[in-house]
């Protein structure tokens, strides 16, 4: 593996590790699945990662086409994505992102705690937007639109996939 590909993998992995924030989402996952048994927790973890994988990879491959169909240039989307990533970074610095996630989890539990059967939370709120949020979707599109070589695209996709696999492991442990 060349140094350029290793650098690309590392940059992509670190970027998605911060964006997906598996360690920050794990307590929310644990809270949202607290009412279910081990099989329910495992099912929600696997389904949420499958949903997030489909969404992120779908936008990584088809996002540029979708933007073109809506007459939005990739540069305009990059500018909006940069602003979004900056806002996420500010939230992380001031710990507001974690507070919002915890608030959503408490709100969800408060409205659904009387249900005898736990809800299917794998698509919303876990798969989308907690794992496959706007930041990770936009970043996947950016990384894939910059790469013309399929080897580089494979490196980007493998770094994203490793992050999603790591998120699954963290969910299963939580």
Label each residue range with its predicted role.
Residues 39-102:
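Membrane helix-loop-helix hairpins that form the core translocation module of multi-pass transporters
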Residues 27-32, 164-174:
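Transmembrane alpha-helical segments of integral membrane proteins
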Residues 31-43, 72-75, 114-118, 144-151:
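Juxtamembrane helix-boundary/capping and inter-helix hinge elements in multi-pass membrane proteins
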Residues 1-19, 95, 103, 107-126:
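Small-residue-enriched transmembrane helix starts and helix-helix packing motifs
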Residues 8-25, 74-83, 154-167:
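Structural signature of hydrophobic alpha-helical transmembrane segments
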Residues 17, 26-33, 124-129, 136-146:
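Generic transmembrane alpha-helix signature in multi-pass membrane proteins
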Residues 2-3, 64-73, 140-153:
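Membrane-interface helix termini and inter-helical loops of multi-pass transporters
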Residues 6-60:
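Juxtamembrane transmembrane-helix termini in multi-pass membrane transport proteins
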């Amino acid at each position: 593996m060349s140094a350029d590909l290793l650098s690309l993998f590392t940059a992509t992995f670190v970027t998605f590790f911060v964006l997906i924030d598996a360690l920050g989402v794990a307590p929310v996952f644990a809270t949202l699945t607290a009412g279910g048994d081990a099989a329910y927790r495992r099912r929600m973890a696997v389904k949420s990662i499958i949903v997030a994988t489909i969404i992120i990879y779908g936008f990584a491959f088809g996002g540029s086409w979708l933007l073109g169909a809506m007459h939005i240039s990739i540069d305009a989307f990059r500018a909006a994505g940069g602003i979004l990533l900056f806002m996420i970074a500010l939230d992380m610095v001031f710990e507001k992102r974690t507070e919002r996630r915890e608030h959503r989890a408490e709100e969800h539990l408060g409205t659904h705690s009387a249900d005898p059967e736990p809800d299917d939370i794998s698509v919303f709120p876990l798969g989308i937007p907690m794992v496959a949020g706007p930041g990770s979707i936009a970043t996947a599109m950016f990384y894939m639109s910059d790469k013309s070589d399929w080897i580089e695209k494979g490196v980007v996709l493998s770094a994203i996939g490793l992050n999603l696999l790591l998120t699954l492991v963290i969910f299963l442990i939580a």
